[in-house]
Curated annotation (Swiss-Prot):
GO terms for molecular function: 1-(5-phosphoribosyl)-5-[(5-phosphoribosylamino)methylideneamino]imidazole-4-carboxamide isomerase activity; phosphoribosylanthranilate isomerase activity. Its EC number is 5.3.1.16, 5.3.1.24. Pathway: Amino-acid biosynthesis; L-histidine biosynthesis; L-histidine from 5-phospho-alpha-D-ribose 1-diphosphate: step 4/9; Amino-acid biosynthesis; L-tryptophan biosynthesis; L-tryptophan from chorismate: step 3/5. It comes from Streptomyces griseus subsp. griseus (strain JCM 4626 / CBS 651.72 / NBRC 13350 / KCC S-0626 / ISP 5235). InterPro entries: Aldolase_TIM, His_biosynth, HisA/PriA_Actinobacteria, Isoase_HisA-like, Isoase_HisA-like_bact, RibuloseP-bd_barrel. The active site is at residues 11, 130. CDD domains: HisA (cd04732). Keywords: Amino-acid biosynthesis, Aromatic amino acid biosynthesis, Cytoplasm, Histidine biosynthesis, Isomerase, Tryptophan biosynthesis. The keyword Amino-acid biosynthesis applies. It is found in: Cytoplasm. Involved in both the histidine and tryptophan biosynthetic pathways. Transmembrane segments: none annotated. This is Phosphoribosyl isomerase A.
Length: 241
């Protein structure tokens, strides 16, 4: 059976690596240089990096040059997210050499564009489904974006390759992942799912690992690593067991 992929996260705001609580602007804790953080995860054995431009996600500017520098310095696979919602931002993201990009808000506000991008770029495109209950939330999690399962059915029919599922109520809280939500999404699609939000312990990662046969492919880990709840080495060992 394939093992759960771990994607340590580097979220960038105003040029700094930060973590938010519930994805809310103003709740951030700063952790210094994004490049240093990314290189630390790489040297600890990560196979993926989840790199997010929070300013672009919130529409408060961007960190495009810095994001490109970090992505370019990596020998591992990079998943890029944040504010990718038109041809220009998508081209800039793909130009970094990242393995894939996550579309968020754009998928909710411009469905025709997303269908075109999925058709053109295939598995380089993942769609972020940011959920509160069964309602999707767009643009930096401040707007409603429709029903999760209706959107999932539409994206499936358009050939979307994978989904990154975040329970906003859990994100940045260290309260544990929403395993029920992950199960429900996996039951509704045959595409792989990457879990995001709430991972607080090695037991949480082991619990997500048990969902690999149901369709969970990976887990994004952020605050727990920065808060030193466990090391990345310990996490990689836990999901390999």
């Amino acid at each position: 059976m394939p093992k759960l992929e771990l994607l340590p996260a580097v979220d960038v705001r105003d040029g700094q690596a930060v973590r938010l609580v519930h994805g809310e602007s103003g709740s951030e804790t700063s952790y210094g240089s994004p490049l240093e953080a990314a290189l630390a995860w790489q040297s600890a054995g990560a196979e993926w990096l989840h790199l997010v431009d929070l300013d672009a996600a919130f529409g408060t500017g961007d960190n495009r040059a810095l994001i490109a520098e970090v992505a370019g310095a990596m020998d591992i696979k990079v998943e890029l997210s944040g504010g990718i919602r038109d041809d220009a931002s998508l081209a800039a993201a793909l130009a970094t050499g990242c393995r894939r990009v996550n579309l968020g808000t754009a998928a909710l506000e411009t469905p025709e564009w997303v269908a075109k991008v999925i058709a053109e770029h295939g598995d380089k495109i993942a769609v972020g489904l940011d959920v509160r209950g069964t309602t999707l939330r767009g643009r930096g999690w401040t707007r409603d974006g429709g029903d999760l399962y209706e959107t999932l059915a539409r994206l499936d029919s358009e050939g979307c390759a994978r989904y990154v599922v975040t329970d906003i109520a859990k994100d940045g809280t260290l309260e544990g992942p929403n395993l029920g939500l992950l199960r429900d999404v996996c039951a509704a699609t045959d595409r792989p799912v990457v879990a995001s939000g709430g991972v607080s312990s090695l037991d949480d990662l082991r619990a997500i690992s048990l969902l690999v046969p149901e369709g969970v492919e990976g887990a994004i880990v952020g605050k727990a690593l920065y808060a030193k709840a466990f090391t990345l080495e310990e996490a990689l060992k836990a999901v390999a067991a």
